[in-house]
């Protein structure tokens, strides 16, 4: 069961990455880890650094993928963003531009992916 969830998550991240590239985002990393957790995707949207959380669900029996973006998870994303910015500083490549947190929710309905893209999500 856990392997199924991991495979679904990997599929969702790949699907989201392809979607973002079609929109013109430049993907620079995936699966970035630190002690606070993992950032699914990191990209540039023109001159803005964006970290992207991807949530993928099969059906809506336990709520939609979008509903799984709880306040606690959004606050964790804010910590992850700060950790990533600090890692850039430590690597002597500080980011001085704009940044934001996006979320992509993918719900499979009858095998068809339904994607919602939330830009600049609130952490409050």
Curated annotation (Swiss-Prot):
Instruction: Spell out the InterPro entries in the cross-references.
Output: Restrct_endonuc-II-like, tRNA_endonuc-like_dom_sf, UPF0102_YraN-like
Question: A Pfam family in this protein?
Answer: UPF0102
GO molecular function annotations of the record: nucleic acid binding
Q: What family is this?
A: Belongs to the UPF0102 family.
Q: What is this protein called?
A: UPF0102 protein Haur_0145
Taxonomic lineage of the native organism: Bacteria, Bacillati, Chloroflexota, Chloroflexia, Herpetosiphonales
């Amino acid at each position: 069961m856990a392997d199924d969830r991991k495979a679904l998550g990997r599929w969702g991240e790949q699907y989201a990455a392809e979607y973002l590239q079609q929109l013109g985002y430049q993907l620079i990393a995936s699966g970035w880890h630190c002690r606070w957790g993992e950032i699914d995707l990191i990209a540039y949207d023109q001159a803005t650094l964006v970290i992207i959380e991807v949530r993928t669900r099969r059906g809506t029996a336990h709520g939609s993928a979008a509903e799984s973006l709880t306040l606690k998870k959004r606050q964790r994303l804010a910590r992850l963003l700060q950790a990533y910015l600090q890692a850039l500083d430590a690597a002597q490549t500080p980011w001085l531009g704009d940044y934001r947190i996006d979320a992509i929710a993918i719900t499979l309905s009858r095998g068809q992916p339904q994607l919602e893209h939330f830009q600049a999500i609130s952490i409050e």
